[in-house]
């Protein structure tokens, strides 16, 4: 079963890469009314940190704020509600590689697509090769935000972060 899931994720990764490569302009402008924007509080009981393969829970309640910023998004992450931001960066929804300001001096880039009012996709590249995919989605009622991320080298090791709207 794990092999099927891993194979499926590889197929999805390849398909997403092809779609994005063929349609760099694909996407939508950021609109403040889009349901994906807001302040989101992690539901630790429904979130799984599996990058190490151990299906661990997150030790603290993360807070993520997604806000429209020009023709893109400002993405801010706090490791707990009382902590200072772990990171905060702005990104354009143009599907192009831009330097990753979270790690100055590294050969790391981020590309973002706003595929629908409730979907954002992020591709991270390190040394020119895709090192992470992230898909952000919001439920149809706008109350639940989910972040699913994985590294192409181990697609079966996914982080699933589930958040509820805080504002």
Regions flagged by a language model, labelled:
Residues 9-19:
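Bacterial N-terminal signal peptides
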Residues 1-4:
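Positively charged n-region of N-terminal signal peptides that target proteins for export
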Residues 6-11, 28:
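Generic secretory/membrane-interface signal
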Residues 26-167:
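Hydrophobic small-molecule pocket/channel-lining residues, especially in calycin-type beta-barrels
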């Amino acid at each position: 079963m794990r092999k099927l899931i891993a194979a499926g994720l590889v197929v999805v990764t390849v398909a997403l890469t092809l779609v994005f490569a063929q349609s760099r302009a694909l996407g939508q402008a950021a609109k403040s009314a889009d349901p994906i924007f807001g302040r989101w509080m992690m539901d630790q009981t429904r979130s799984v940190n599996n990058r190490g393969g151990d299906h661990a829970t997150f030790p603290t309640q993360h807070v993520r704020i997604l806000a429209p910023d020009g023709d893109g998004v400002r993405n801010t992450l706090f490791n707990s509600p009382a902590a200072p931001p772990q990171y905060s960066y702005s990104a354009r929804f143009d599907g192009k590689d831009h330097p990753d300001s979270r790690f100055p001096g590294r050969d790391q880039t981020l590309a973002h697509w706003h595929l629908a009012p409730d979907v954002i996709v992020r591709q991270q590249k390190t040394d020119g090769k895709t090192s992470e995919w992230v898909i952000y989605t919001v439920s149809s009622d706008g109350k639940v935000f989910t972040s699913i991320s994985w590294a192409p080298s181990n697609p079966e090791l996914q982080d699933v972060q589930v958040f509820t709207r805080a504002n």
